[in-house]
């Protein structure tokens, strides 16, 4: 059973505030590499853009949205790729003409650009990816707490 009282609501609001203000949310630099983390779930997905500045990782921006009814039928790989594509579209003003690193815990994304004959949405998405200079790094169990918060918060706000 899930219990949501004023204590839980207040804790959630404090967490939300902490994740969206400095020192967590920072300004981008022109000298540091960008990192893009994405996560998809059954209800939505989110992206977090960050940079390693000095001895800490600084979040630059968040992006998220709820899945449409049709998108909820996508398999996990397609949802993860959709999260990546929407993150790129939303955060493109940071990422165009920059080399950046995409960190994922979904190993299938590593080979997505080598797909032999993509069709439909996959073909359109791969065309979009060609505009960007990035490398994909697979990390088993990438920390997703910030991403999970972005996804769940978006789902809560939009019902």
Model regions and ranges:
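Acidic, metal-ion-coordinating active-site neighborhood of RNase H-like domains
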Residues: 1-159
């Amino acid at each position: 059973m899930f219990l949501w009282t004023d204590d839980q609501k207040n804790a959630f609001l404090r967490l939300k505030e902490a994740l969206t203000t400095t020192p967590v949310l920072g300004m981008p630099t022109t000298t540091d590499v960008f990192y893009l983390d994405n996560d998809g779930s059954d209800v939505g997905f989110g992206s977090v853009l960050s940079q390693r500045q000095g001895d800490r990782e600084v979040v630059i921006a968040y992006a998220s949205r709820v899945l449409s009814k049709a998108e909820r039928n996508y398999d996990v790989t397609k949802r993860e790729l959709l999260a990546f594509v929407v993150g790129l579209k939303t955060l493109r003003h940071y990422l165009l003409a920059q080399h950046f690193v995409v960190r994922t815990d979904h190993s299938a994304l590593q080979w997505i650009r080598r797909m032999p004959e993509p069709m439909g949405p996959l073909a359109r998405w791969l065309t979009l990816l060609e505009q960007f200079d990035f490398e994909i790094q697979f990390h088993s169990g990438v920390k997703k707490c910030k991403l999970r918060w972005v996804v769940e918060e978006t789902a809560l706000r939009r019902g």
